[in-house]
């Protein structure tokens, strides 16, 4: 060990020494070894790429082989188990057949009596375990009978159970369990033992094995065991005393039944009908039953057969429509659905059905159950024959059904409603308007929302009456009507259906047109799902009036029908009471209602009502419209509107006019032309002009305010005009403006006003010269007309007055006092003139100029009286009005000047503000 360590130490020392060549040799070796490793890695990658697909294929083949082996083993085991189960079922079936041979009308749809087996299991009719076992046995028996009858379908496909048979519907596990379908009956006090009735009293077996539609929006609802618990009375069966129908009325059905179908809801009657529906009856010693068709399926699916069983007697009687009218019995309704294919469309005549009518009337009693459910069991289905065009109505009439409990009709009614809901869901899956060729317009449904039937109407006049009843409650009603059109006469086979939106998950329901027939004397009334119409019972098309033109609707609306209280279901008795006064619905008039449809709004109006407005009403409307237009265009004040109402009476009430027929025809007024007299027109124009003046220049109250500030007792104190605003003014400018003011005032005012102003000035004057000067001025004004006076006279008068006034001021102190008084009087007269001018309605063209002249007159220069006298004399002698000197007014104090200045400023700003507003 020590030698090895020494060798390693010596080797490392020699390798690490700088003079040794071992390091160079090791580097070359390292490079070569790395290159070799890289090449090996490349070879490995290439091999993996080529080998991976083959390995994957091998793995998949291995997995597939394992799966096949597993499937083979499972299928082999399943086959064995299925064979064992089939053998057990056959044994059980043969064992159950030994209890009692079935009474069948045809190999298809046999019903076996399991009552004895049920009694052997347990005497207690309420035992759920025994009921479940009985339901399973019944399902097995039904399935076996269907499998045996599938290869060869008999033309007569109907079956019935014995006198004491219990009816049980076989259901699939996906919908409901057999336990929920078994219902027991209460024991009858009579000696015969009680019967056990399954939850579905009468339900078609084709619904059990029919494939679910492709567009079912909702799955079928499970049936609760509490919805169909009822006993049925025990009585011996009756035999139909009439033979079978002719063989050419037998329907041909293709045997295509699928067992993997979901459970359909309960039904009472399923009556298949196309253009003409044929029924095959089978006679048996103990009982008989009628074969019916199941609910409608999409056109791609094959037809289905339904089997109706009963315990007492036949529940259906086929009668023609006219013969049913002659009986006068109470009506009802049932579910009707057409088959899709394989139907013999040869229609029998009405006479072929009449030979067995007496037998039918004798074999069945007329004791109907007086309940709403029995009224719902009768339907009317009217159809046209494809050959010959004869109309034959097939009616299913329930007879002699009696129950021990009064709750049985309500339970059966719930069964009918659930079945109708399922049929409605199946119809909602289809696209609107996609009717198959065999699906005629005579399609009807019986559901919780509509207990109505359909009838082929040969014209397109239909008054609709939609109903929306959820869970047997009528929520709202509305009258709807379709207007007649002439196009329906050309092709009466095409029916226009009213679309009804149900709010279900699908887009909307199929175009439904169900009706219910109400017999009233010789006439009949068809209550549509979406309408009500009165038609005659003759086979000929009724004569319809031509389309009426559309007019304006009446102002009086038609009262809507009253809403029924909640919990009250719509039945045939309520439909019959539509024509009676005491019914909750309004009585329909004998004449058809004409309809105006504007944007989805329906207006109902009787035929005899006025279809257009009267000329007087049109004039009233025009008058009101023109009045509104005038008010909007002119914007007249309330005074003008009041005067207009005095001369133009308002339009009378159209309702009163219609009653009295005495119409006051108003005058048609063109906008801008008022029917006023000349005097009223002048007054109106003057009033409007005054209002315009007031709006433009201010209201008269402003002038009153200015006059109140310039009263004679305090005018001198308020005549303080500051020179800071306009500066000193020359006398010539003042004199010129004064002359212009006097000239304009003399030319625009009447003679009386000038006399009054001159009298005011003459009373204030003192002195002979002054009095003469004041007298000459009014004389000149009186001699000359204000409108024809010349400018020279006015100017001379004004200059003379002003000159005498100035000369008087230069005399002495008394002259100064008199001059001040004259100035005050002149200002007062001027303002009064302007005030009267505005009150008289004249255009105030001189308002601004007069105000400016007054301001200039007041703003006399306050100089010495000698200078004023000298200037006035120089102006009078040389007639040179251009004097550059100025003088302040010494007779006004500073306080008075400030007050006058503030007043002038405010008075000057008010018109400007009014104009800007």
Curated annotation (Swiss-Prot):
Compositional bias ranges of the Basic residues kind: 63-74
Residue stretches of biased makeup (Polar residues): 164-177
Predominant subcellular localization, coarse grouping: membrane
Compositional bias ranges of the Basic and acidic residues kind: 782-797
Region (Disordered) location: 55-80, 152-195, 773-797
GO terms under biological process: cell differentiation; spermatogenesis
Superkingdom assignment: Eukaryota
Subcellular location: Membrane
GO CC annotations, alphabetized: membrane
Composition bias, Low complexity: 152-163
Tagged with keyword Transmembrane helix: yes
InterPro entries: SPATA31, SPATA31F3-like
UniProt KW keywords: Differentiation, Membrane, Spermatogenesis, Transmembrane, Transmembrane helix
UniProt topology in membrane: Single-pass membrane protein
TM ranges: 29-49
Keyword Transmembrane helix listed: yes
Task of the protein: May play a role in spermatogenesis.
Family that this chain belongs to: Belongs to the SPATA31 family.
Name of the protein this chain belongs to: Spermatogenesis-associated protein 31D3
Organism: Homo sapiens
Organism lineage: Eukaryota, Metazoa, Chordata, Craniata, Vertebrata
Gene that this sequence comes from: SPATA31D3
